[in-house]
Amino acid sequence: MNAIGIAGSGLDVNRQWLNAISDNIANMNDATPTSGPAFQARYVEAEAGAGTSGVFVKATVLGDSTGIVESDPTSPLADANGNVRMPNIDLGDQMGQLIMAQRAYEANAKVVTDAQTTYQAALAIGKNN
């Protein structure tokens, strides 16, 4: 696999990672009844492929469904005690993950750009001879 293919596989993994993080952040304030499960955060596990085959998503793991029981008597989903179940998602952790995923995406995109520039320069050398 060439540099563009390897970086492309990294871009795909980063895209899935960013999607999971954005989904987690978007749903972190979703209340559910205490009788049901809380929103489960998604975590992407990546693994290097054999040799130079790039990287791939090994698994998407779901977080804890028990969540955190909080008092919110004004919620239409509250139980008789005024409690709802909230996802156990740490915004600080998700923002840290978001920054790492964004930087990894940018690094892979730069590899693609630099490889294209290098390939174009190599083709230009061949044309001049």
Per-segment meaning from a language model:
Residues 1-129:
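Amphipathic alpha-helical polymerization modules
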